[in-house]
Amino acid sequence: MTRPAAQTDTSPPQQTEAAAPPKQSLPTKAVRWWWIVALLGSLGLLIGSALVASDHQLHGVELTFFHAINNWPDRLYYPFLAASIVSESLWIAVAVVIVTFVAKLYRLAWQVAAATVAGYGTTFIIRHFVARPRPPQLLTDVHARVHDTALGFPSGHAMISTVIVLLLWSYLPRGWRWLTLLIIPAMALSRVYLGTHAPLDVVGGFAIGLGVVAVMRLLPLRLRQSLRFD
C-alpha cells in the first residue's frame, strides 16, 4: 500500500503588506514648555533692554562692556569684520532661502523666509519707537571702525543670526550644532568691537530672533501645517 504523495502548495505566494513608515512624533510637552520659557524670556529681555535703551545713553554695566570690547586691539579688525559681513542681515537670509530651496528643503526655506519678514517687521517698528542712535552719536571716545548712521536698537544682525541658527539647528549634524551656536556671540562681539552697536542693541536683536522662532514653534499644529511650517 503506497502512501499518497504530499500535495505541494502551488498557489502564488501572498505578498506581505509593506510596513507603514513610522509617523513623526509630535513635539513633546517638554519641548513645548522649553519654547514657552524661551518666548517669555525673549519678551523680558526685549522689554528690559528697550526701556534702558530708550533714554539714549550708555551708562553703568553697558558702558563698561562697550569700552572693554570696543577697545580691543586693531589686529582683530579683519576677523570681526568678516564675522559681521557673514551675518550681513538681509543678504544672509536671502542666501539661506535660496540654498535651502535648491536643496529641496522647502519647509525650511519657507520658515526662514517667514521668520525673516516677521523679524525685520518687528525690528523696524521697535527701532523707530526706541529711536536710539549708534554709539558714535552717543559717545565721543568710540573706535568707529565701520560707519553706520541708521538707528541702533535693536540690531538686525543679531536678530537674523539668531533666527537662522535656531531654524537650521535640527537640520545640522549633531557635531555641528553646538559649533553653529558660536555664530551668535561672534556676531554680537563683532558689532560692538566695530563700534556700530552698543551691547543692549545686540541683546534686543537676539531677543527678537528668539521670540520669532518661539512663536513659530508654538503655533497650533493645523496652523503650522497650513503655513507649511510642518
Each PLM stretch: what is its role?
Residues P21-Q24, I98-R107, L168-P173, V215-L221:
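Structural signal for the C-terminal ends of transmembrane alpha-helices
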Residues A30, N70-Y77, L81, T100, ...:
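Membrane-helix interfacial "entry" motifs
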Residues R32-L39, V94-T122:
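Interfacial segments of alpha-helical transmembrane regions
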Residues L45-S49, V117-I125, I183-T196:
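Aromatic-anchored segments of alpha-helical transmembrane domains
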Residues S84-K104, I160-T162:
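Hydrophobic alpha-helical transmembrane segments
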Residues L139-D230:
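Membrane-embedded catalytic cores of phosphoryl/pyrophosphoryl-handling enzymes
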